[in-house]
UniProtKB/Swiss-Prot annotation:
Swiss-Prot/TrEMBL cofactor(s): Mg(2+); Mn(2+)
Species, as recorded: Vaccinia virus (strain Western Reserve)
Protein name stated in the entry: mRNA-decapping protein OPG121
EC number: 3.1.3.-
Gene for this chain: OPG121
GO molecular function, one term: metal ion binding
Chain positions recorded as N(7)-methyl-GTP binding sites: E16, R50, D151
Role according to the record: Decapping enzyme that remove the protective 5'-cap from both host and viral mRNAs to commit transcripts for decay by the cellular exonuclease XRN1. Accelerates viral and cellular mRNA turnover to eliminate competing host mRNAs and allow stage-specific synthesis of viral proteins. Acceleration of the turnover of cellular transcripts may even promote the shutoff of host protein synthesis.
Amino acid sequence: MGITMDEEVIFETPRELISIKRIKDIPRSKDTHVFAACITSDGYPLIGARRTSFAFQAILSQQNSDSIFRVSTKLLRFMYYNELREIFRRLRKGSINNIDPHFEELILLGGKLDKKESIKDCLRRELKEESDERITVKEFGNVILKLTTRDKLFNKVYIGYCMACFINQSLEDLSHTSIYNVEIRKIKSLNDCINDDKYEYLSYIYNMLVNSK
């Protein structure tokens, strides 16, 4: 089943409210963020696992000079185990319970558009950087989705644009190599993330981009 132009589909997770809408063109501005729904040469959808969780990054950005972390307990389930250990090390009162050792901050690969780049050139550059130059693009799809995400924990709204990207590498080519990119710690198959809160809407995005005409 496809999605018609300007039709809006809504997904909600414990943390996010996501609006997905098919559009004709990606606007070009200094704040435009573009993402690739990557498909391997053997047909697997790819997703990135971020090196640092968004929750922990937000805490670090608000850290004061006396090195005290003030942390809402609502954020704890959205952090990596090593980040929780760092918080626990500085804890003066309270406790940390119900830690999920399997948490991963899943993201679509991509980034911010440079004003001198085309959309596709931006995605080629970002994929090259985030994969330590392991990913090369075979072709892009023609369908464009606008993704509007409201982060309910921080009450912020993020807008991005996504298109399918068919790459030359197989899943095997990418799954057994270490990545040293500052932002991405791992590239993996979305099919391995069925228990993640984001899996449902990420799967929908891939299906729409690959199967829509």
